[in-house]
Each structure stands twice: as structure tokens, then as C-alpha cells.
Regions:
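Divalent metal-dependent hydrolysis catalytic cores, especially in the metallo-beta-lactamase
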Residues: 54, 70-99, 112-126, 152-166, ...
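His/Asp/Glu-enriched, well-ordered alpha-helical/loop segment
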Residues: 223-232, 250-263, 267-351
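Metal-dependent enolase-superfamily TIM-barrel catalytic cores that perform enediolate-based chemistry
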Residues: 99-120, 127-190
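Di-metal (Zn2+ and/or Mg2+/Mn2+) metal-binding site signature of metallo-dependent hydrolases
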Residues: 42-64
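Histidine-rich, glycine-flanked metal-binding segment
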Residues: 1-45
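Active-site gating loops and adjacent loop-to-helix segments of metal-dependent hydrolytic enzymes
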Residues: 74-85, 126-153, 195-207, 218-231, ...
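Active-site core of metal-dependent hydrolases
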Residues: 150-269
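Conserved, mostly hydrophobic/aromatic
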Residues: 41, 119, 175, 204, ...
Length: 367
């Protein structure tokens, strides 16, 4: 495939030129040959990488339903995501284990690629557990992590932990040898967070949500992540984080910012009542809350929505694309995706100047 005359995202900026690819990217620049597509006025960007998504279109990875996996892969691709981490809820080990088996055994027919698992629970603190059932919380447990990772076929790429809980620091030290460890759903202080980062943690789960806010005398995880050089997630639906704070985080953290969807099964679905980890949530005007409360419960947006939102909030398009593709791939060690370079997977999006999706390629195949 040869696409010509596009604005191609390479590194951290756009260049005018052409791109040739098969299953992998073969060449970028001014290329000889007749174009298969003259994409003048369009952008070619890396396929988006969502490292924090629980589900969509009525499906949730924690359900452990094999028949739900392909519809999810198709949904993600249709909304610009070419690689994702299947993200779990805070549930009992006996519920998470069969869900790990389903993810392990999934072989997509088409759509986005499942690049692994994000264990967002159950190693959370009570006070910052979010929209999760308290009875399913568990102290950080290295042996449990290894059992769940084995059940997934060794596919856990990211795990969220409250490092201040009993056993939390040892968990960080040991598990960071296996996958990326993120601090989140935590009551940790600045000093505790800095110790965890020194022990091997390198990421923060949905910054500002599920942690103490930034205080000038108690800076907490938010400042620690900045000082430690950690990558940080943001839910950019316009509900979880004010646009001014998104701009602030972008200015402070730069290319360590990771856009995520944190999407639930309600994404791509109408408003109504849905189930989340054994609890009821209500979605109204796209806002998901625990039923009868104002407690936010994840989002209903796609990653492409997040990109469009942050551009609307004032971020440069190049920075938005980087934060939704290259940065998350780097954060969780996905080496073959997330950027446009020769030899990497031809996971590509073509967007028009309104950021509407014109084409999606996964391993060079149009979806």
C-alpha cells in the first residue's frame, strides 16, 4: 500500500510525504511509484494504544465471556484503537482467573489487537477504591499476581497498586521485574510514592482520580509522579478532569502524558443502567455514575474522542497523537506499535482535517 501527500506523524511531529507499508511499515518520505491513495489534506498517525479500557458495546473483560472479545476488538478498531490492554475490575481471584483464561485464549479474526492485560484491581485502598465493591479489595499479594499472570498466559503488562497498603512496597519491588507497576486507587503520601517509584513503579493510574488531590503542603502522588519521571494517565472526557487541569498536566509532564479511555461496557451504548463489577451504574448524557450517587464510574468515550477533546481543550494535535499512541506504548513496553517507523507494525489511522476517521489499518490490513 502506498499513501501519498499526507501529513505523517513521525517521532513527535508531522511531515508532508508518503508512506509505503505491507504488514509492517516499509518506507516513509518522498517515495517513487503510483499512489494507491492520494491523501492530500489528511493525517496518517499511529494506531491509538489504550492501556486502560474495561470494555464497550455491552461487554466487559471481567465478565470472562469468550463471545464478547471479538465485538470489543471490532469496536476499538472502529474508533481508532489498534492495540489495547484488557483492563479488569476489582473482583475476587476466582472471578478474575477465568477472565484471564478468556483473554489468553482469544485469537482475533479482525479488529484491534489485545496487547495484554491491565490488572487495575484488586490491590486498592479502601478510601480510594472508586466505583468498586469493598468486599473484593485485597492487600497487595505477589503470589496472587503471579497466579493471575500465569492464568493470562503471562500477558499482564500493567498492574495498579496502592503501595501504602501492607505488603505494597515489596509488591512493587518484585512485580516491577515482571511488568509495569502503576500507583493508583491509593492514599499514599508523597514520600510513600517516591519510595515506590524508587523501588520500580513507573506509572500513575488516571492522575487526580482515585488519589488525594494536589495540596501545597501534602503534594502526594501527583507531585511525586512528576518528580520521579513517571508516566501518567488522564481520562479526558471533560467530566473527570477540568480542561484547565489537562492543560496543566500537559505542561508539567510533557511527553509522559498518556491519554486513556477508562471506558466501561456503556461505551458505544445508549444512556441507561449497566452493571460494573457487581454494582449498578447509571449513564445519563454520557456520564457514568454509581446508581443513585455522584460517584464517577469510568467513562463512555473512545480514545479518538479523547484526542479530539484535548485538541479542543488547547493541546497541539501532535502532542495529542503522541499521548494516545507512542507514550502509552512506551509506558507498558509495547515495542512494535505506537509509532511510525520502518519495521514496526503497520497499525495506522488516516484522519481528515476534522479528525474524522477515514481508514484504519491493523498489521497493514484495512479494517
Amino acid at each position: 500500500m502506498l499513501i501519498k501527500n499526507a501529513k505523517i506523524f513521525v517521532g513527535k511531529s508531522f511531515l508532508e510525504g508518503d508512506i509505503r507499508f505491507g504488514k509492517t511499515i516499509e518506507a516513509v518520505g518522498r517515495l517513487e511509484g503510483e499512489a494507491d491513495w492520494d491523501a492530500k489534506g489528511c493525517y496518517v498517525v499511529p494506531g491509538l494504544v489504550d492501556v486502560h479500557t474495561h470494555g464497550a458495546v455491552g461487554e466487559d473483560f471481567s465478565d470472562g465471556k469468550a463471545e464478547g472479545m471479538q465485538p470489543l476488538a471490532d469496536y476499538y478498531a472502529a474508533h481508532g484503537v489498534t492495540s489495547y490492554l484488557a483492563t479488569t475490575m476489582t473482583l475476587k481471584e476466582e472471578t478474575l482467573t477465568p477472565a484471564m483464561h478468556v483473554i489468553r485464549d482469544f485469537h482475533r479474526a479482525h479488529g484491534a489487537k489485545c496487547a495484554g492485560v491491565h490488572l487495575e484491581g484488586p490491590f486498592r485502598c479502601y478510601d480510594k477504591r472508586g466505583a468498586q465493591a469493598a468486599e473484593n479489595l485485597h492487600k497487595p499479594d505477589v503470589a496472587m499476581f503471579h497466579r493471575l499472570n500465569e492464568a493470562s498466559g503471562g500477558q499482564v503488562k500493567l498492574v495498579t497498586v496502592a503501595c501504602e497498603e501492607e505488603g505494597g512496597m515489596d509488591f512493587v519491588s518484585q512485580v516491577s521485574q515482571v511488568c509495569t507497576v502503576s500507583l493508583g486507587h491509593t492514599c499514599c503520601t508523597y514520600d510513600q510514592a517516591m519510595e515506590a517509584f524508587a523501588r520500580g513503579a513507573s506509572h500513575a493510574t488516571h492522575l487526580f482520580n482515585g488519589m488525594d488531590g494536589l495540596h501545597h503542603r501534602k503534594p502526594g502522588l501527583i507531585a511525586a509522579a512528576m518528580d520521579a519521571g513517571a508516566s501518567v494517565e488522564l481520562i479526558c472526557d471533560g467530566l473527570h478532569i477540568h480542561p484547565a487541569v489537562i492543560r496543566l498536566v500537559h505542561n508539567l509532564y510533557g511527553d509522559r502524558l498518556n491519554l486513556i479511555s477508562d471506558s466501561l461496557r456503556c461505551a458505544g451504548m445508549p444512556d441507561g443502567d449497566y452493571e460494573l463489577g457487581g454494582q449498578s451504574i447509571t449513564v445519563k448524557n454520557g456520564k457514568a455514575c454509581l446508581t443513585g450517587t455522584d460517584t464517577l464510574a469510568g467513562s463512555s468515550i473512545s480514545m479518538l474522542d479523547a484526542v479530539r477533546n484535548v485538541v479542543r481543550f488547547g493541546l497541539p494535535l501532535a502532542d495529542a497523537v503522541y499521548a494516545a499512541s507512542t507514550a502509552p506504548a512506551l509506558a507498558v513496553g509495547l515495542k512494535d506499535v505506537g509509532s511510525i517507523a520502518c519495521g514496526k507494525a503497520a497499525d495506522l489511522l488516516v484522519l481528515d482535517h476534522h479528525l474524522q476517521l477515514k481508514a484504519v489499518y491493523v498489521d497493514g490490513e484495512q479494517q
